[in-house]
């Protein structure tokens, strides 16, 4: 199966490369197309683009990963956000359209409310619109204090999130069409993983944005860890406790709801 592998951290991210290796390991063909720059927090946006009529695409060899025939895996560095990359893949921009999308491995958690803003999850939800199943994969890399960047210095345990994703992928291939999963794993050695749990979304995400200053020309922002207490069965709490969490995500859909339509019509002067 041709599987789109993308992210929002950019084509050079080691997390992306680890996820590509996981796709190869389970016998599928990775179609690697990821942003040429960091699009973290892009959600499912399709822009802005420098040129609305053209998207830049450059070849990029994925380091340390070879395909089943031993040849290097060559991907695409794309001047676009991840959701648009999913759309371009569906349009045949990187060869025959893929049948599935996996996104990540994100540097930092995508739990709770953060799922709304995540470009990693946005890429997967965009793929669902094209009939694909998909999985967003994130590693709970801590926030560095005072820098506004996610990711502590030193080694990140990409291999843990990649190993869990590799186990789940065969199931996802056989799952009903348009199944969307959100996987978060702790940033810890695989031997220390507590296990894999279903989890609900926490009331808030694992990280949050704060305003640290303001003046006449703008606002200063920073990204900090969210130390609020979370429900025990939530994704944020379980990942903090050393579990990998899997949360099926519902795509955008209308809800059945009783609305005061007649009252609104009367208010705008339309009465039968």
Regions of interest found by a model, annotated:
Residues 9, 38, 81-82, 106-109, ...:
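Short glycine-rich anion-binding loops that position phosphate/pyrophosphate groups of nucleotides
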Residues 128-153:
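Glycine-rich phosphate/pyrophosphate-binding loops
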Residues 3, 19-90, 96-97:
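A cross-family phosphate/adenosyl-ligand binding-site feature
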Residues 22, 123-128:
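Hydrophobic/aromatic ligand-binding patch that stacks against planar heteroaromatic rings
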Residues 149-272:
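Electrostatically charged, flexible surface regions
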Residues 1-9:
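Nucleotide-activated donor-dependent transferases that construct or modify glycoconjugates
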Residues 109-118:
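Glycine/threonine-rich flexible loop motifs
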């Amino acid at each position: 199966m041709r599987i789109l592998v993308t992210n929002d951290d950019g084509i050079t991210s080691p997390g992306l490369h680890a996820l590509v290796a996981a796709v190869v390991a389970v016998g599928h063909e990775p179609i690697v197309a990821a942003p040429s720059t960091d699009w973290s927090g892009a959600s499912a946006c399709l822009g802005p683009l420098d040129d609305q009529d053209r998207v830049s695409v450059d070849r990029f060899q994925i380091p340390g990963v070879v395909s089943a025939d031993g040849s290097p895996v060559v991907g695409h560095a794309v001047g676009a956000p991840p959701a648009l990359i999913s759309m371009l893949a569906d349009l045949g921009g990187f060869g025959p359209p893929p049948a599935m999308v996996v996104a990540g491995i994100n540097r930092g958690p995508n739990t709770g409310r953060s799922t709304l803003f995540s470009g990693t999850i946005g890429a997967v939800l965009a793929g669902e619109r094209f009939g694909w199943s998909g999985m967003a994969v994130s590693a709970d890399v801590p926030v560095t204090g005072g820098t506004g960047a996610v990711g502590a210095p030193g080694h990140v345990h990409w291999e843990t999130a990649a190993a869990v994703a590799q186990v789940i992928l065969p199931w996802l291939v056989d799952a009903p069409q348009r199944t969307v999963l959100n996987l978060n794993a702790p940033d810890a050695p695989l031997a220390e993983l507590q296990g894999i749990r279903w989890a609900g979304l926490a009331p808030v995400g694992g990280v949050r944005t704060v305003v640290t200053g303001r003046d006449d020309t703008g606002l200063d922002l920073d990204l900090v860890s969210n130390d609020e207490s979370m429900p025990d069965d939530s994704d944020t709490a379980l990942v903090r406790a050393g579990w990998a969490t899997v949360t099926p995500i519902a795509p955008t859909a209308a809800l059945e709801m009783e609305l005061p339509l007649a009252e609104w019509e009367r208010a705008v002067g339309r009465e039968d």
